[in-house]
UniProtKB/Swiss-Prot annotation:
The record marks K41, G42 as: Reactive bond for trypsin. This is Kunitz-type serine protease inhibitor superbin-1. The keyword Signal applies. It comes from Austrelaps superbus (Lowland copperhead snake). It is found in: Secreted.
Amino acid sequence: MSSGGLLLLLGLLTLWEVLTPVSSKDRPEFCKLPADTGRCKGKFPAFYYHPVHRTCLEFIYGGCKGNPNNFKTIDECERTCAA
């Protein structure tokens, strides 16, 4: 196979890895945690994975503490936790 063909194959495999959803067995345990606003009084839009609904939902994050099931964007939440 030529070097161009190898680069194309590598690019396609990388794209497949990025676009393939996370399976439930590969989902991090913290994706099962409930939304946690934290201790601070800020009002920052954030997203968390809701395991019963199997989707990412918005909540208001206080800005500190909380738990790892807390994402700045819905895309980041879906890439990490959604199947």
